[in-house]
Amino acid sequence: MEIDKNVDTLSEGQVDELIKKNIIMTSLEAVFNWARGNSLWPLSSGLACCAIEMMATGASRFDMARFGYEVFRPSPRQADLIIIAGTLTWKMAPAIQRVYEQMPEPKWIIAMGSCACTGGPFADSYAVVPGVDKVIPVDVYVPGCPPRPEALLDGFLKLKAKIQNPAKVGLKHGK
C-alpha cells in the first residue's frame, strides 16, 4: 500500500495501518518488567550438592548468559534473585532471611532441589527447614535431587514469564 507522507491526506484505515506497523503501544511498567525478566542478577546460595549443578548451568555447555542471567552478584544489595540450592537448616535460616531483607525490590526466589523445596530426604530432621518457603517467599520451585542444569534453566524461564506477565499470575507491579 502506497502511503502519502502528508498526514492531512491519510484516511483512518491508513493511520491504523501505520500504527500497527511502526508504533508500539505499551505501558512503562511493561517495559520495566520486560527488562527485569531479561536481565536477572542472581545471588547464589549453594548450601549442598545442588550448587554443583548451579555452577554447571553457568558453564559454557548450558550457557545461561544467552538469557541474560550470567552476572552472579557477590552482594544481596546488587542482586534481584536468590537461588537457594540445597538443604536449609534452622540455624542458617536467619542468615538467609537477613540476605533476603537486604535485597532491593523487586526481588525473586528460586528454590532449587528437593531439599530447598521440601526438605528432601532430611525433612524429618529436627535441624532441617522443611522447605525454604517456611522462611522466605518462593517464586519458582525447581525439583530434583539434584536438578539438572536444564531444569534450572527452565526455572529461569518460568520466572521470566512470571515477571513479564504479572497479571497472568495474579501479581501487582511484578511482585
Swiss-Prot record:
Catalysis: reaction(s): a quinone + NADH + 5 H(+)(in) = a quinol + NAD(+) + 4 H(+)(out)
Keywords for the protein's UniProt record, in alphabetical order: 4Fe-4S, Cell membrane, Iron, Iron-sulfur, Membrane, Metal-binding, NAD, Quinone, Translocase, Transport
Keyword Membrane included in the entry's annotation: yes
PROSITE patterns per UniProt: COMPLEX1_20K (PS01150)
Keyword Membrane tagged: yes
Gene3D superfamilies (alphabetical): 3.40.50.12280
Gene Ontology cellular-component terms listed: plasma membrane; respiratory chain complex I
Subcellular location: Cell membrane
InterPro entries on file: NADH_UbQ_OxRdtase-like_20kDa, NADH_UQ_OxRdtase_20Kd_su
Single annotated GO MF: iron ion binding
Pfam families in the record: Oxidored_q6
Biological function: NDH-1 shuttles electrons from NADH, via FMN and iron-sulfur (Fe-S) centers, to quinones in the respiratory chain. The immediate electron acceptor for the enzyme in this species is believed to be a menaquinone. Couples the redox reaction to proton translocation (for every two electrons transferred, four hydrogen ions are translocated across the cytoplasmic membrane), and thus conserves the redox energy in a proton gradient.
Range of residues in the leader sequence: none
Main localization (coarse): membrane
Name this polypeptide is given: NADH-quinone oxidoreductase subunit B
Protein's gene: nuoB
Membrane topology: Peripheral membrane protein
The record's free-text note on cofactor binding: Binds 1 [4Fe-4S] cluster.
Superkingdom of origin: Bacteria
Residues the record lists as binding [4Fe-4S] cluster: 49-50, 115, 145
Protein family membership: Belongs to the complex I 20 kDa subunit family.
Cofactor(s) required, per the database record: [4Fe-4S] cluster
EC identifiers of the protein: 7.1.1.-
GO biological process: aerobic respiration; electron transport coupled proton transport
